[in-house]
């Protein structure tokens, strides 16, 4: 187990860097809606990186009398995977902001559809167990930052947005491994007339591990949105999550 912990901490650290996904989870749109975003990342003394992600929603049905949907984000890496693939969270469709700020805890199930190793799913107890093993703790917040609406212009289109302050503090402190602290601070501009609500977001990510500090600035910008026919077939969940499979067959 001692040899496992550095690998587990590395993978769980990647999850904390994706804490910004919680800004999309509040009051999800109806199944079939989608949106695309460009993410620009800038690190000191390195060229800027550009990536594109797509969010979508598909129906799951009811759980304990409440409507649940799958929030899909793709393509992204998960738990240290070499491959990028769709990552899906099974969430209440009417999830409030408090629930969205606790995205991992709010998910009834998480599915990572690895195209090479195959899909696998995590249940809440799997998330809790893995968090305990690596000493993972995180807090997210999204709060109003300006009582007045702001105009955000993207190309030929202008959006009337509410500005919110985003903060995330994460600690990963497993035995035998140096503690890592990850701090995300930024601003989100939201317009609730579009799917997922987010028009633009800008934030800084700082990772502190011992005397090593890494920083990156990111800008996420809406590039498109719409509605399509949601898939009718059941989602392929694959095998249940296993630490051994994660470490030796990922």
PLM regions with names:
Residues 4-16:
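Bacterial N-terminal signal peptides
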Residues 20-106, 113-114, 118-250:
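Acidic, serine/threonine-rich low-complexity disordered tracts
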């Amino acid at each position: 187990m001692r040899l496992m912990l550095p690998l587990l901490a590395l993978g769980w650290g990647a999850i904390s860097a994706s804490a910004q996904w919680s800004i999309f989870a509040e009051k999800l749109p109806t199944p079939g809606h989608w949106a695309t975003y460009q993410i620009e990342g800038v690190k000191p003394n390195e060229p800027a990186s550009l990536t594109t992600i797509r969010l979508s929603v598909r129906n799951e049905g009811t759980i304990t009398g409440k409507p649940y949907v799958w929030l899909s984000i793709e393509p992204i890496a998960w738990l240290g995977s070499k491959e990028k693939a769709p990552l899906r969270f099974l969430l209440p469709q009417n999830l409030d902001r408090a629930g969205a700020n606790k995205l991992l805890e709010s998910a009834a199930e998480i599915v990572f559809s690895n195209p090479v190793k195959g899909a696998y799913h995590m249940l809440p107890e799997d998330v809790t167990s893995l968090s305990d093993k690596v000493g993972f703790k995180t807090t997210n917040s999204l709060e109003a930052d300006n009582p007045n609406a702001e105009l955000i212009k993207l190309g030929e289109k202008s959006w009337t947005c509410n500005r919110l302050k985003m903060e995330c503090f994460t600690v990963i402190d497993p035995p035998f491994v140096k503690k890592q602290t990850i701090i995300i601070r930024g601003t989100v501009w939201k317009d609730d007339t579009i799917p997922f609500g987010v028009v633009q977001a800008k934030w800084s990510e700082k990772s502190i591990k011992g005397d090593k500090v890494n920083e990156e600035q990111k800008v996420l910008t809406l590039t498109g949105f719409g509605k399509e026919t949601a898939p009718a077939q059941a989602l392929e969940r694959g095998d249940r999550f296993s630490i051994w499979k994660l470490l030796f067959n990922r």
